[in-house]
UniProtKB/Swiss-Prot annotation:
Disulfide bonds join 51-97, 146-195. This is Killer cell immunoglobulin-like receptor 2DL4. One of its GO terms (molecular function) is MHC class Ib receptor activity. Receptor for non-classical major histocompatibility class Ib HLA-G molecules. Recognizes HLA-G in complex with B2M/beta-2 microglobulin and a nonamer self-peptide (peptide-bound HLA-G-B2M). In decidual NK cells, binds peptide-bound HLA-G-B2M complex and triggers NK cell senescence-associated secretory phenotype as a molecular switch to promote vascular remodeling and fetal growth in early pregnancy. May play a role in balancing tolerance and antiviral-immunity at maternal-fetal interface by keeping in check the effector functions of NK, CD8+ T cells and B cells.
Length: 377
C-alpha cells in the first residue's frame, strides 16, 4: 500500500516539529537564560541575569540548583532581569528560570537552559607562559602552560572576547608546581589569553586571572580556535540562535504547505475534467470514420456483382456440357481488413445478393424445362 506525497510530507513535518522545534516540558517552551556582561564575574562585582520567553511570559522566578543557597532568590519574582550585586562566592553555581503569566498563576513554563556563574578572585593567580615563545610564525605549533605553587585540581584557559573556555586537570611538575599544558596547534593569528585555577570541591569558584599573555603571529593570518578538550558549558546564544532558525523553518513550511496542497487539488480536478471529455471525442471520430466510403468494400461489392452477372448470361446449353461444379473466384485485396459496413453499403449488398438469388433460380428453371421431353412426340 503506497502513501501519497501529501501524507508523507505531513508525517515528516509533524516529526520535525515534535523532535526539533518544540523543546518543552508539560507542553510549553523553554525560556532562555543569559548573563550580562559575562558569566565569569570577579568577587565584589555585579552581574545581571536575564530571562527571555517568546510566548508572552514576562514575569519570572529564579532558582539556584547547586552550591550555597542564595536567600535573596527565595519567593522572588522579577521582570525579565535580575541584578546580583555585589557578587560573593555564594552566588557561584548553576541557575535556571521559569516564567508564568499573572492571570494564570498555575501555568508555568518549563525550566530554562542552565546558566553557570563563575566567581573569580578567591585564590592567588597562576602564571601563564607560551612555548616556543609569545611570538611565532604562522603555522608553527603553540603550547600554553598554566602553573602555580597552589595545588589546584583544574586549570581553565580563556581567550579574550570568547565566552567558552578550555579545561584541563593540573599535574605535578618536576619543579614542584602544579601545571597544565594546553596545545593550541598551528598558530594562525594573534590573541590574548588568561588562565584560572580551581578545586574539585568548588568548581565554580576560581582564582584570580593570570596576567594576560598576548600571542603574536608573523606571516599570513587566518581565523581558527581549537576545539576545547573539555568544555565547561555551552554558550546559550548559539542554542538560542539555533532554536530561532528551527522556528523560522517551521513557519516557512506551514506557509508553503497550503499552497502545495491547493495546487495538487486543482491539478487533479483538471485531469478528471479532461478524462471525462475524452470518450465523447473518440466516439465522434469513430462515427465520422464509419461514414466515409471504404474503397476496398466498394470494390468487393462490384466484384460480386460482375460474377453474378456472368453466371446469369451463361446459356443452358453451355452449362449442360460442363460439369455441375460451380467455380468460385476469390481475389485477395492488399491490406484488406474486415470492417463494418455502413448502412448504405449494407443495403446495397443485400440488394445485390437478392438479385443474385433470383438470377440463379431463373437459370435452374430454364435448365429443368429444357431437359423435360415433350409429351406426345
Amino acid at each position: 500500500m503506497s502513501m501519497s506525497p501529501t501524507v508523507i510530507i505531513l508525517a515528516c513535518l509533524g516529526f520535525f516539529l515534535d523532535q526539533s522545534v518544540w523543546a518543552h516540558v508539560g507542553g510549553q517552551d523553554k525560556p532562555f537564560c543569559s548573563a550580562w556582561p559575562s558569566a565569569v564575574v570577579p568577587q565584589g562585582g555585579h552581574v545581571t541575569l536575564r530571562c527571555h520567553y517568546r510566548r508572552g511570559f514576562n514575569i519570572f522566578t529564579l532558582y539556584k540548583k547547586d552550591g550555597v543557597p542564595v536567600p535573596e532568590l527565595y519567593n522572588r519574582i522579577f521582570w525579565n532581569s535580575f541584578l546580583i550585586s555585589p557578587v560573593t562566592p555564594a552566588h557561584a553555581g548553576t541557575y535556571r528560570c521559569r516564567g508564568f503569566h499573572p492571570h494564570s498563576p498555575t501555568e508555568w513554563s518549563a525550566p530554562s537552559n542552565p546558566l553557570v556563574i563563575m566567581v573569580t578572585g578567591l585564590y592567588e593567580k597562576p602564571s601563564l607562559t607560551a612555548r616556543p615563545g609569545p611570538t611565532v610564525r604562522a603555522g608553527e605549533n603553540v603550547t600554553l602552560s598554566c602553573s602555580s605553587q597552589s595545588s589546584f585540581d583544574i586549570y581553565h584557559l580563556s581567550r579574550e572576547g570568547e565566552a567558552h573556555e578550555l579545561r584541563l586537570p593540573a599535574v605535578p611538575s618536576i619543579n614542584g608546581t602544579f601545571q597544565a599544558d594546553f596545545p593550541l596547534g598551528p598558530a594562525t593569528h594573534g590573541e590574548t589569553y588568561r588562565c584560572f585555577g580551581s578545586f574539585h570541591g568548588s568548581p565554580y569558584e576560581w582564582s584570580d586571572p593570570s596576567d594576560p599573555l598576548p600571542v603574536s603571529v608573523t606571516g599570513n593570518p587566518s581565523s581558527s580556535w581549537p576545539s576545547p578538550t573539555e568544555p565547561s558549558f555551552k554558550t546559550g546564544i548559539a542554542r538560542h540562535l539555533h532554536a530561532v532558525i528551527r522556528y523560522s523553518v517551521a513557519i516557512i513550511l506551514f506557509t508553503i504547505l497550503p499552497f502545495f496542497l491547493l495546487h495538487r487539488w486543482c491539478s487533479k480536478k483538471k485531469d478528471a475534467a479532461v478524462m471525462n471529455q475524452e470518450p465523447a471525442g473518440h466516439r465522434t471520430v469513430n462515427r465520422e470514420d464509419s461514414d466515409e466510403q471504404d474503397p476496398q468494400e466498394v470494390t468487393y461489392a462490384q466484384l460480386d456483382h460482375c460474377i453474378f452477372t456472368q453466371r446469369k448470361i451463361t446459356g443452358p446449353s453451355q452449362r449442360s456440357k460442363r460439369p455441375s461444379t460451380d467455380t468460385s473466384v476469390c481475389i485477395e485485396l492488399p491490406n484488406a481488413e474486415p470492417r463494418a459496413l455502413s448502412p448504405a453499403h449494407e443495403h446495397h449488398s443485400q440488394a445485390l445478393m437478392g438479385s443474385s438469388r433470383e438470377t440463379t433460380a431463373l437459370s435452374q428453371t430454364q435448365l429443368a424445362s429444357s431437359n423435360v421431353p415433350a409429351a406426345g412426340i
